[in-house]
Amino acid sequence: MDIITLLGAICLAYGGMLILYYRLRTTEKRKELSQLMLNGIKNMRRGNLDKALIYFDKAYEYTIETNNREEMADALYNMGIIYKEKGEMNSAMEYLNSAQGVYDELQDKDGSKKVTAATQSIR
């Protein structure tokens, strides 16, 4: 009976450690994602569009890993705006349409409105 109790305690401890590990890992990824988005916005405002694209692209990759749809839509939207500023309208529309799709899935009306305004200014 003591062995069964010991094995049960070990399993519970192991399960607790796994939960703790994944929570810490998720928190780290969220912090990294926030930092990437912030750096992208800073560079976009400073006019460093190519550098901003790199940050937003990395942020987009993180959103796929973490299934963070809200940040995914924002990263796509920002990449669309950058391509618009660079005069690459086809790429801009592609990213903005992708962002629109995610905003629609999330039923984010504010996000949808800003994408609509951006796409109308391209047409």
Segments predicted by a language model, with ranges:
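Residue signature of alpha-solenoid helical repeat architecture, marking inter-repeat boundaries
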Residues: 27-31, 70, 110
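Flexible helix-coil transition and linker loops at the boundaries of alpha-helical arrays
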Residues: 25, 63-69, 104-106
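TPR/TPR-like alpha-solenoid helical repeat scaffolds
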Residues: 107-123
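Long, contiguous interaction/recruitment modules in multidomain scaffold/adaptor proteins
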Residues: 1-31
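TPR/Sel1-like alpha-solenoid repeat signature
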Residues: 36-39, 43, 55, 62, ...
